[in-house]
From Swiss-Prot:
Residues 1-20 form the signal peptide. It comes from Arbacia punctulata. One of its GO terms (biological process) is fusion of sperm to egg plasma membrane involved in single fertilization. This is Bindin. Species-specific sea urchin sperm protein required for adhesion of sperm to the egg surface during fertilization. Bindin coats the acrosomal process after it is externalized by the acrosome reaction. It binds to sulfated, fucose-containing polysaccharides on the vitelline layer receptor proteoglycans which cover the egg plasma membrane.
Amino acid sequence: MDSQVLPLILLIIVFAASSAHGHFPHRTNQDSDCPEASNGCWCHDSFAQCWKTYEVANIARKKDVIRKLELLSLQLEDVLKYIAQLPNLEAIKLGPEGDDHLFECSCDNVLELSGSVVSVVNANDVHVTGCLEHGWSRDIYTMNAFATRCRRRLILESGGAEMRHRRSAKDDDVNKRASPRKGSSPAGKKVQIMEQDAGKGDAHNEKEVVKDQKPTKELFDFFMGHRRKRRSIDDVIGEMRAERQRRYAQGAGGMQGGYGYPQAGGAQYGGQPVQGYMNQGPPMGQRPAAAGPAGGFGAPQGQPPVGQPIGEAAGGGEFLGEPGVGGESEFAEYSSSIGEGETINAEVMEKIKAVLGATKIDLPVDINDPYDLGLLLRHLRHHSNLLANIGDPEVRNQVLTAMQEEEEEEEQDAANGVRDNVLNNLNEGPGAGAVAGAAMAAGMPPYPGGAQGGMRVGGQPQNPMGGNAYNPMTGYRQQG
């Protein structure tokens, strides 16, 4: 029985030895399991350890079975050659063990090594040196840290090259740039547009169309593009000014009676004279004979209906006459927005839009709203630090000029809005004719038609500046 078992045991030992030899590297005490030391490689723990170049080591016959490799005192180029020749290599150790190994500071070799599928098990102990000579801030880096810096530099260099290529192209658009420091003018002034003849569909029938590109025009069209009908700059300017003036007038609506003017609609009842108002005549309900108001816009001469106000001004009464002051003609007379020379011209508005596109401001308002476009200029003025982002001095001066013009127009429109609001209040509500007389006494411009004074009982008209109002002709108050 023992004689049969012994050959079997020997067979197993021989098979195991041959198997261990075939799965190089394998830790063993027998030198025959590893390459000869004289060739520059042998086994060390679970690694095949080499200290000579791949050509000298002569391990080509074992290259398919080597999965772990330790290289001693070799240059990075030789390490890369080992990795390229060993297809099943999984891990590599760079030594000698326990001692920092220094490689030349080369991004190409380090990135190639770190980008391979082979893992460097002691990458934190491997350093590159001589980096100051290559323009780095330090002379020595660990391999992992240097690989990270190389990737970062590569990204920056490729991005810079792409940016230079983009800026040199003919279709460069200033509105697509990431920073205003790159300038406010595109590299190319013209765009070559190839339009193919749709009728024939032949490549030889392509025609070249050259058109000037205006970045500010494109910016304006971009903002207005989602609307069904694009508006011109003049339309936007007109709407902006009209909307702003309307809001100023609304804001002044709560100040009736200010600025030395009497409260609109607050005239006294008939027969009760009050200082600053024209006499309204006898109390309503009595039917005296009344003369027609001077100007011809009132009721016919005779007795007005019971309860009807007497002495209505032009267009001011709810029942008498037709609208007068406050119409389009008066708006044209008293509003400075009608004058062509006092509006923001299209050129200045184009410059403003160019700056908005160049500074890439996060707009806090809807630029499609004409009133908000005015708020945007106010936002620029109140946040003057935004001007520091405009690198072009000429463009910065243009923005400052536009801001100054806008501020002056806001002040003028505010005054016009208050004035128009007072004028409208003079011709609305009860007692408007009396308020008109007080407004005239305060130096307001004359109005067409309207009552020139109160009425006496029996149809006897008072002094043309009658009532208890101030007469600007004499400088004294007249008692009716």
